[in-house]
Swiss-Prot record:
<dbReference type="Pfam" id="PF03742">
    <property type="entry name" value="PetN"/>
</dbReference>
<keyword id="KW-0934">Plastid</keyword>
<protein>
    <recommendedName>
        <fullName>Cytochrome b6-f complex subunit 8</fullName>
    </recommendedName>
</protein>
<dbReference type="GO" id="GO:0017004">
    <property type="term" value="P:cytochrome complex assembly"/>
</dbReference>
<comment type="subunit">
    <text>The 4 large subunits of the cytochrome b6-f complex are cytochrome b6, subunit IV (17 kDa polypeptide, PetD), cytochrome f and the Rieske protein, while the 4 small subunits are PetG, PetL, PetM and PetN. The complex functions as a dimer.</text>
</comment>
<feature type="transmembrane region" description="Helical">
    <location>
        <begin position="5"/>
        <end position="25"/>
    </location>
</feature>
<dbReference type="GO" id="GO:0042170">
    <property type="term" value="C:plastid membrane"/>
</dbReference>
<dbReference type="GO" id="GO:0015979">
    <property type="term" value="P:photosynthesis"/>
</dbReference>
<keyword id="KW-0602">Photosynthesis</keyword>
<keyword id="KW-1133">Transmembrane helix</keyword>
<keyword id="KW-0472">Membrane</keyword>
<comment type="function">
    <text>Component of the cytochrome b6-f complex, which mediates electron transfer between photosystem II (PSII) and photosystem I (PSI), cyclic electron flow around PSI, and state transitions.</text>
</comment>
<dbReference type="InterPro" id="IPR036143">
    <property type="entry name" value="Cytochr_b6-f_cplx_su8_sf"/>
</dbReference>
<dbReference type="GO" id="GO:0009512">
    <property type="term" value="C:cytochrome b6f complex"/>
</dbReference>
<dbReference type="GO" id="GO:0042651">
    <property type="term" value="C:thylakoid membrane"/>
</dbReference>
<dbReference type="InterPro" id="IPR005497">
    <property type="entry name" value="Cytochrome_b6-f_cplx_su8"/>
</dbReference>
<dbReference type="GO" id="GO:0045158">
    <property type="term" value="F:electron transporter, transferring electrons within cytochrome b6/f complex of photosystem II activity"/>
</dbReference>
Length: 31
């Protein structure tokens, strides 16, 4: 099985970006 480091890095980056973005939205909406 070949592990694609670049794909894993992009996946992790998108997860972190989406998570932090949702936290910002939650913070602004007061939830």
């Amino acid at each position: 099985m070949n592990i694609d480091i670049v794909s894993m890095a992009w996946a992790a980056l998108m997860v972190v970006f989406t998570f932090s973005l949702s936290l910002v939205i939650w913070g602004r909406s007061g939830l």
